[in-house]
Amino acid sequence: FKYHAGFNEESSEKVTMGEWTWETGMNKDQVEEAEYIRDYGLLVVYSNWSFLKNDYSKKEEYANRSLKWVAYIAGKRESRRLIGDHVLTENDLVDFVEYPDATGSTTWTIDLHYPDPANTLYFADKEFKSICKMKKIHPYPIPYRCLYSKNIENMFMAGRNISVTHVALGTVRVMRTTGILGEVVGMAASLCKKNEVSPRAIFPTYFEELKKLMEQGISKSDLPNNQMYNQGETLGPKTNVR
């Protein structure tokens, strides 16, 4: 049988692998319509593949090709975000607002994704290809108060669900940064257990102790820095910072 996503010679993607640009649900509710977004993502992948194999004028180029792997559970750039005692905003990042509970730094641009206009020509409101628009910022330390819930006493968060706005998430959400925040949360959790307190009590009462743990880190300091690509095209370190 044939899929019906409307592919033709002009609208089909002549590719042999996926890229970050394949992104569905940009005009949908990322939480309430998550199942639809996943299903539509699978639909366009298999629809495009079916067209290339069966109906494309140059289908012989794909005759001996087969799909090796398609993720059933796709990666999410954005979904639920929880509210902490501080909500990080675009203004915080752009104006480099300094907070006394600074933790791990983000080193990426404010990277926001939108439907690709070329894809919109054929799939208006049902786009599955994206473009990104990046705003350069200085590397910015995430406040500790973004890493725990303001209304659930014993809950930390450290990934793409931390207390930030949609725009601020554009720089925070990359894996190396969320990994660093995970380390911070682990350190803070150890202090909560040690001192028998909730996450909110760490700042300011035990924050100096947390700072010492963060300065010590958990990595091997003698290893070379091979993660420069994670720094994006930032404005470089901010000078005259307290």
What are these regions (language model features)?
Residues 1-242:
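Flavin (FAD/FMN)-binding glycine-rich loop and adjacent Rossmann-like elements that form
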